[in-house]
């Protein structure tokens, strides 16, 4: 996982317009590196075209934004489609983190961490 962040408005608006970040995201996406965003941040991915034709999710008030940009929206807590992981918000943050850990370190490591924080799915 190369980039992972969570911002809400107006932060995502500023991030979407910050050229060094969008260039880096595009480089990572084009190289097939794993990228992840939660809450409103998936709208930055969709604005860059990363979610077009992909399953994705976001904070409820941003679902229309990512759908308008071509995402196939889902209300799942976490959606992994290829190298892109998206999640809905604070209430799904543990699921999001465990998904990323699973992708990077495997299911056993994610289970170990879930147990260490007394997480119950």
Q: What is the meaning of each model-derived region?
A:
Residues 1-121:
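Active-site-adjacent pocket-lining segments in enzyme domains
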């Amino acid at each position: 996982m190369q980039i992972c962040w969570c911002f809400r408005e107006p932060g995502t608006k500023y991030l979407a317009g910050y050229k060094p970040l969008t260039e880096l995201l595009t480089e990572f996406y084009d190289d097939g590196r794993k990228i992840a965003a939660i809450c409103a941040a998936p709208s930055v991915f969709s604005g860059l075209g990363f979610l077009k034709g992909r399953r994705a999710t976001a904070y409820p008030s941003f679902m229309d934004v990512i759908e308008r940009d071509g995402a196939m929206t889902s209300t799942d807590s976490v959606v992994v489609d290829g190298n892109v992981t998206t999640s809905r918000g604070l209430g799904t943050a543990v699921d999001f983190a465990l998904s990323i850990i699973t992708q990077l370190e495997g299911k056993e490591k994610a289970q170990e961490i879930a147990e260490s924080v007394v997480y119950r799915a």
